Amino acid sequence: MANVLKEKMYDELLSATCRILKLGSHDYRITERNLLSKNPKFPLCDIILKLDYAYNLEYLLSLWEHVTKQEPRFVFKNTGGAVSMSCYLHAPVKVEGHHAVRECNILRVNECLTVRMSDIVAMKPSTFAVFTKCIIRRNRDDTYVVEFVAFGPENESEYISLLKAIFLKKCSMGKQHLESNRFCQGLRRRSSHVLEKGRFESSGKVVNKASAVVTSQESIKQFYEKEKSLLSGVKFWRLSERHCRFALVGICFLLALYFCYVLLKKTPTPASGSVV
């Protein structure tokens, strides 16, 4: 079970280191687990650091210390063409150089600088400062500068009072936010109540509109029937007018024939023979 935990710790430290330092596949070299099990004072990994890049060194050291419950050490070495950083879980067997860690450290060829968490804390202006970052810069010739940048207040009490003021401001803003949320909830409830009333009223209006539509349709039908009856009456009147005209013409013709017949009957007819 202990070996499984060690393997998990090994994988966790490597993945966290690559993630925090944003390393590529060609930027580091890993020591095998078998060698670490035989000699735990070997470095877990060796990293080639880039120039003018800010590495979150304190965050990585604090994470290693939290995971391993030990005091890890990061050893910077000038290899001549670059600066490498070897990450140790335990103190290395041979430490090359015993430089005191400062904000700016000059490394000549083959010189080393060992950094622990206590060294970073000692450089910080306050314990509650922002995480310290490490930057590698090229100096004259083949020398490099390992610079540790730490931001923080010089007066601890002022920093604590500032944090308290920020906390109180956030608390007051949180209370205002809660009150505004309650007010908004009340408005939402009122608006929902008004909307429900509006829905009921609108449903009544819809029913009234539907009845009005029905009545309007009935009135349209009645009007159409009336118009239809009127049109039929007009048509009948026109037909009856035509028939009356024909009847009058026929009566006049018959009267003319009768008048002619009477005239012909009254006129005397001449005698057919001579009178003696």
From Swiss-Prot:
<dbReference type="GO" id="GO:0016020">
    <property type="term" value="C:membrane"/>
</dbReference>
<keyword id="KW-1048">Host nucleus</keyword>
<comment type="subunit">
    <text>Forms a heterohexameric complex with NEC1.</text>
</comment>
<feature type="topological domain" description="Nuclear">
    <location>
        <begin position="265"/>
        <end position="276"/>
    </location>
</feature>
<comment type="similarity">
    <text>Belongs to the herpesviridae NEC2 protein family.</text>
</comment>
<keyword id="KW-0426">Late protein</keyword>
<keyword id="KW-0812">Transmembrane</keyword>
<protein>
    <recommendedName>
        <fullName>Nuclear egress protein 2</fullName>
    </recommendedName>
</protein>
<comment type="function">
    <text>Plays an essential role in virion nuclear egress, the first step of virion release from infected cell. Within the host nucleus, NEC1 interacts with the newly formed capsid through the vertexes and directs it to the inner nuclear membrane by associating with NEC2. Induces the budding of the capsid at the inner nuclear membrane as well as its envelopment into the perinuclear space.</text>
</comment>
<feature type="transmembrane region" description="Helical">
    <location>
        <begin position="246"/>
        <end position="264"/>
    </location>
</feature>
<dbReference type="InterPro" id="IPR007626">
    <property type="entry name" value="Herpesvirus_viron_egress-type"/>
</dbReference>
<keyword id="KW-0472">Membrane</keyword>
<keyword id="KW-0597">Phosphoprotein</keyword>
<feature type="topological domain" description="Perinuclear space">
    <location>
        <begin position="1"/>
        <end position="245"/>
    </location>
</feature>
<dbReference type="GO" id="GO:0044201">
    <property type="term" value="C:host cell nuclear inner membrane"/>
</dbReference>
<keyword id="KW-1133">Transmembrane helix</keyword>
<keyword id="KW-1043">Host membrane</keyword>
<dbReference type="Pfam" id="PF04541">
    <property type="entry name" value="Herpes_U34"/>
</dbReference>
